[in-house]
Regions:
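Membrane-embedded beta-barrel scaffold of Gram-negative outer-membrane proteins
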Residues: 111, 117-125, 146-185
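Face-selective signature of the C-terminal outer-membrane beta-barrel domain
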Residues: 1-83, 111, 167
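Short acidic, glycine/serine/threonine-rich loops at helix termini
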Residues: 131-133
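Transmembrane beta-strands of outer-membrane beta-barrel pores
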Residues: 12-18, 71-75, 122-128, 137, ...
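Extracellular loop and loop/strand-boundary signature of outer-membrane beta-barrel proteins
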Residues: 1, 32-42, 84-95, 136-144, ...
């Protein structure tokens, strides 16, 4: 008996918010740093749409393949003065970036017995830069941050008993334009 199952779906999110910094307290107030002084204020909007198809096909009992296919559209808009303390210098956002991602994942599962399973998968995933990546790269000498791309290969073994589960997962992750916490490319 061969089994096939599939799920199709989509999602849409829109975020809109003002980002601001306000002086809450200073020991010795000066002109630009009086309590309640707003030292930056900008608006950011993010639209995130995705559509996906997940499918599984069982070739023979215990051996199945799967495919997850995702399309993702992301638009980021930021306008206005930025947090100079975080960015280490004063600047204003004038940003309108659009990203189109295709994120596929393919794999095999082989159930040797009810207790033992082997699996392997390959995936490509993308991630857009976040606010801090832009803030830390808004120097004229630095490149604007690019979307991150990850190629991920995994193989593993899983043992599942009534009251105990153990597994071994080996993976290789290869990044291009990795976005690290400092915002560096």
């Amino acid at each position: 008996k061969r089994n096939f199952s599939a799920t199709l779906g989509e999602g849409w999110n829109r975020y809109s918010n003002d980002h601001f910094g306000r002086v809450t307290w200073v020991k010795k107030p000066v002109d630009d740093f009086m309590p309640n002084h707003e030292y930056y204020n900008n608006n950011a909007k993010k639209t995130d749409y995705n559509a996906y198809l997940k499918a599984t096909y069982e070739f023979v009992k215990g051996l199945s393949a799967f495919a997850d296919l995702q399309y993702r559209y992301v638009n980021v808009r930021m306008v206005g003065p930025a947090d100079a303390t975080s960015a280490k210098r004063s600047f204003s956002y004038d940003l309108n970036e659009t990203f189109n991602f295709f994120n596929p994942k393919f794999g095999l599962n082989y159930e040797l017995s009810p207790l033992h399973r082997l699996y392997a998968s390959y995936a490509i995933a993308h991630r857009e830069p976040v606010r801090n990546n832009y803030e830390h790269n808004m120097d004229a000498e630095l490149e604007k941050p690019r979307a991150e791309r990850l190629n991920d290969l995994e193989v593993g073994y899983e043992f599942t008993a009534k009251n105990f589960t153990a597994g071994l997962n080996l993976y290789h992750m290869n990044y291009k334009d990795q976005l690290v916490p400092t915002g560096e490319v």
